[in-house]
């Protein structure tokens, strides 16, 4: 993930109703951008071999898209994509970065002898003014489950303002996936919840015993708070492929050349996922994404490259997968079908976080249909 605007929505926008909330840029910077201004965070992404290999291959196997061209790197971070673009033959690279990481990007450009090509610009992509249109927009904008962080908004803004009509996007396409899985995470999180409640009950007893104040009236609220944290929040995990017990389904496809912010502000899908493993338990759904570097119809890639964050026997990426616990879990068998209705919207409190709702129902191979269950999950 590269860097760009997290933020609390202004009260005036909420009061007005209707359109998208206005973002407080200072709050956004404090909550989101600042994370990417640290080298340790950049190093985490630079050490992700799947990520690095995919972007490196996409650029150098398709050098014709870069040779002699003007490139815009949105959220350049350390500047690695800008440097590769220059090494692939770009005439000019504008590398936009909102944080002070911009200075490190300049240092790296100088150290790698591309400072005459790579111009690092510190500022918000929405505010930056370039002296010319660009042939290529490259960006590593993907967040957890693809759309967390909402950085793609800034890429869309850059595309609409600066990309030439025959320009290309790197990546050019993206997909979101959902799959049924087996996992012990639910038991682990339930145990954590009970430990937290046991600690709370001791606190209530001690507070009344030592200080004469009965806190028990807050027990219900405390439990609800912790149920949200332990059971209703998406869990980062690097799953093994054998934990996937059924057919994964695409729930969203994005064409980066044509997508609008309205199209990604809310995601809705209805999918049916056949179970492929007998006598097991559906404990959760897992979400991940992949992106593709295809160029465009008018200017296709010589070699298409895919970056996938699906469960992998060789280990995963820094994105991992997001696990959405289903409570209660369901006993399933091969031949059963899980039908899921899915909705994901941006949090009203922070447009970079996501609120999700899953309605799932089991259709057994015998013909029996279990009642639908609805659960809310928060991707924070």
Curated annotation (Swiss-Prot):
It holds the Pfam family PRMT_C. Keywords: Methyltransferase, S-adenosyl-L-methionine, Transferase. It catalyses: L-arginyl-[protein] + 2 S-adenosyl-L-methionine = N(omega),N(omega)-dimethyl-L-arginyl-[protein] + 2 S-adenosyl-L-homocysteine + 2 H(+). It comes from the Eukaryota. S-adenosyl-L-methionine binds at residues 42, 51, 75, 97, 126. Its EC number is 2.1.1.319. GO terms for biological process: chromatin remodeling; methylation; regulation of DNA-templated transcription; vegetative to reproductive phase transition of meristem. Belongs to the class I-like SAM-binding methyltransferase superfamily. Protein arginine N-methyltransferase family. This is Protein arginine N-methyltransferase PRMT10. It comes from Oryza sativa subsp. japonica.
């Amino acid at each position: 993930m590269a860097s760009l605007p997290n933020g609390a929505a202004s009260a005036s926008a909420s009061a007005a109703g209707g359109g998208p909330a206005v973002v407080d840029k200072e709050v956004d910077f404090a909550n989101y951008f600042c994370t990417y201004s640290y080298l340790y965070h950049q190093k985490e992404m630079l050490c992700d071999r799947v990520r690095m290999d995919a972007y490196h291959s996409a650029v150098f196997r398709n050098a014709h898209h870069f040779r002699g061209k003007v490139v815009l790197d949105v959220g350049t971070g350390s500047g690695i994509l800008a440097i590769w673009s220059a090494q692939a033959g770009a005439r000019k690279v504008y590398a936009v970065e909102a944080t002070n990481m911009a200075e490190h990007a300049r240092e790296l450009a100088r150290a790698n002898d591309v400072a005459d090509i790579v111009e690092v610009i510190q500022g918000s992509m929405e505010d930056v003014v370039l002296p010319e249109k660009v042939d290529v927009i490259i960006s590593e904008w993907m967040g957890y489950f693809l759309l967390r962080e909402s950085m793609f908004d800034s890429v869309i803004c850059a595309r609409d303002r600066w990309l030439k009509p025959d320009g290309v996007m790197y990546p050019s396409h993206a997909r979101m996936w959902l799959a049924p899985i087996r996992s012990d995470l639910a038991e682990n999180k339930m145990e954590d919840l009970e430990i937290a409640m046991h600690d709370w009950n001791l606190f209530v007893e001690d507070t009344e015993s030592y200080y004469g104040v009965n806190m028990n009236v807050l027990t219900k609220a405390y439990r609800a708070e912790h149920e949200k944290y332990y059971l209703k929040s998406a869990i980062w995990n690097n799953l093994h492929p054998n934990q996937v017990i059924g057919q994964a389904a695409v729930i969203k496809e994005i064409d980066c050349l044509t997508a609008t912010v309205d199209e990604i502000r809310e995601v809705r899908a209805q999918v049916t996922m056949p179970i492929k493993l007998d006598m097991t338990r559906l404990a959760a759904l897992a979400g991940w994404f992949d992106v593709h570097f295809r160029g465009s119809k008018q200017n296709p890639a010589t070699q298409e490259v895919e970056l996938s964050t699906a469960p992998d026997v060789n280990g995963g990426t820094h994105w991992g997968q997001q696990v959405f616990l289903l409570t209660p879990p369901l006993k399933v068998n091969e031949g059963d079908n899980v039908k899921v209705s899915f909705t994901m919207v941006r949090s009203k409190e922070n447009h970079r976080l996501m609120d999700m709702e899953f309605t799932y129902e089991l259709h057994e191979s015998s013909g029996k249909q279990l009642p639908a269950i609805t659960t809310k999950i928060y991707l924070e």
